[in-house]
UniProtKB/Swiss-Prot annotation:
Pfam families: MdoG (PF04349). One of its GO terms (cellular component) is outer membrane-bounded periplasmic space. This is Glucans biosynthesis protein G. Belongs to the OpgD/OpgG family. It comes from Cereibacter sphaeroides (strain ATCC 17023 / DSM 158 / JCM 6121 / CCUG 31486 / LMG 2827 / NBRC 12203 / NCIMB 8253 / ATH 2.4.1.). It comes from the Bacteria. Keywords: Periplasm, Signal.
Amino acid sequence: MPAPAAPSARLNRRLLLSAASSSLALAASGLMGLPLRAQEAPADAPPASVPVAAPQQFSYDWLTEEMRVAATQPHVEPENLTGFLGELQYDDYRSINFRTDRSRWADTDSMFRIQAFHLGWLFGAPVRLYDVTDGYVHEVRFSTDDFEYRNELSTRVAAHVDLPGVAGFRLNFPLNRPDVFDELVAFLGASYFRALGRGNGYGISARGLAVNTATSAPEEFPRFSRFYLERPHGGGLSAVLYAAMESPSVTGAYRFVITPGIETMIEVTARLFFRSAVTQLGVAPLTSMFLFSEKNRATYDDFRPNVHDSDGLAVRRRDGDILWRPLNNPPRLASSYFGEENPQAFGLHQRKRSFDDYQDAEAHYELRPSVDVEPIGDWGKGMVRLVEIPTRYETNDNIVAFWVPEGQISAGDAREFAYRLRWGALPIEEPSDIAHIWETRAGHGGVSGVENTGETRKFVIDFKGGLLGGLPGDAEVEAITSVQHGQIVTQTLERLDGMDIWRLVLDVAAAEGATVELAAHIAGYGRKLSETWLYQWMKA
């Protein structure tokens, strides 16, 4: 396995997305300098947690009831920061590091360590952390003594100053080596968080909830305002934490069970209470970046063949059928909807896993994790929505995917959702008898070397492996294709000699400005032999 990308500045560029006013303006340019990096085990014990005035007993049900009551009261925005916290700018924030010798839980037998992110700059809403030990809550307080202030900040910031909270936190764990506490999961900004499987580098993010994303209604960014972290004992390999979520339209009580490994699992339970009606509820939202790949790199003068954190949306349907929708960087805002009932999973995947696919020795896109959302319990009917936002820069997250439950959300409603997030280099060969979509390419239609007078677009889809990959070129198989708002002019299917790949080539025509929806799979001998390829082409 290749060594994980160093958790350097590059890996943190989009932990800050919540600072944008809308997910349709996700420009976090210049944020690559934030100090998230693997940490060595601290040498000194951290200060003891400061207890609240009267330590109280904690349970998930207690937090749930508190958030239910909060939903009956008006939403209150956090107050603006004052003093030096309110004056911090980008360069200042880059000059602040958490002191590793102040890591919380370092003086316990826990396998996990807590480190905080500093308040200020884009992060003006204080987050409170609480330690839950033997069922009782103690607030974990932070001061300027917990942070290193470099450059001219060292003269501006006084020592021993209590902070009103933190911006978020990271949980470290010996993920890749037993002697190094690597960053495992980070919560920073609104309800954003991200995690790593073994050998991964940061890429895709998740959120606690998406409210009115890419709708005519104002978008909200719910935020986690408090976290309650159960202290694992005796070398326990799972961390359990709880979060209070607040927003103008909704409150929530969340439970996270985080289990690190080759694939890091996060089991999420979200109990939601609505102050007001919501135009669109986005459950288990994922946020990623797709700039270009082989199918659209002609407009980029770049030595790298691919630049993306994820290259496709995968949906495993209730009946086991797998949909694969390659991602786009469209000319205008695009949405795709996949109606489902109790899907087995959906997620944003990074299927290309070779350095040669990217040739980026700094970003190491081949190490970015895939993430699957696996519903737990009955989710009923709804749809997976994919939103693709035009961008010119890889520093912008422009891909959003989430579940939209069927039905209206009204004031006074309550909902509960449970699901599992799988983070890692997820396998693509399951089930092994089904060919998966190996590559999607696109270009001018017609015959090579001849002018394309018909103005068609050519799509080349490679299906690899499975039973299909073992069939000879004269096997009785066929491509089942469909198109909306366009026309398939020509269609060919052939086996590539010496490879377990079958290639489908489509020439598609459409009117100017049309949004064309394409679908294809391979079938034969009375059964489906491949995943279903889906694609949206906007003829600009």
